Amino acid sequence: MLQTLHNNLMSNILQDIFKDNYERMIYTLHPRKSVIENVDRMINCGDPSFGGAMYGCGKCGTLKFVPFRCHSRFCPTCGTKYSIDRTTSMSFKLINVQHRHCVFTIDSELRHFFLEDRELLGLLFEAVQSVILRMFHKDNKTEKFTPGFILVLHTFGRDLKWNPHIHCLLSEGGIGNSGLWRAKTHFNYTYLRNAFRTALLNLMEKKLGSSFKKVKAKCYKEHKEGFYVYAKPNKCNPTVVAKYIGRYLGRPVIATSRIDSYDGENVTFHYNRHEDDQ
């Protein structure tokens, strides 16, 4: 008797959307090669024609064929599994202290630079890291307290529009050169906003050259208080931190549960706005 896992034969709504609009995506949007590869893998995920593994019971003789999965983070099925595995791995590396969830955002007028040149995304990590280390080091220049932190890049917002920003899980404390641990619960928001703006704009000017100077000057003029940084206390004990990692580290772009309907042309999905959580 041969059985095939039923769920693997049924395509999810995201697969249907991309199958129906595949040619439009290829010839209208002209996506990058890596995007096409992940879409192809996601579309064919669980398709028995692409192979699988056969399992058999030595007692009753029942055979079960399990189609191979795509293992793409873009896939709502495989991406969720990746997130769970990644969360478990990272949880063992966390310091057993309170953490804080911070978000570093950029001016909307800067977003297109990162869309046109993906290598610039690395500057976001550099800027955030330098700001965090400087904030802790200046508490004691001799000890140079160093915190533990995880940085995750998101290139989209809840509305799925291009919006590169950094999520940071930061320990509320750091270890000094002498091995001394010092707790730190007060984060200077003014410093974080201004320092992040300065660090990022300087890095971008260094990378893009003198042509970026006008944009840089405009950002200083329009954002005199710096770029928005969310860093309010949120009581992230180690258990909560693990949940944050699962939520922000390697999760699929959109869960199928957020897609309300698809009629072959239009997709309706829901999300909660950061501004009012509505």
Residue ranges of predicted features:
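Beta->alpha loop/short-helix hinge microenvironment recognizer with preference
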Residues: M1-Q278
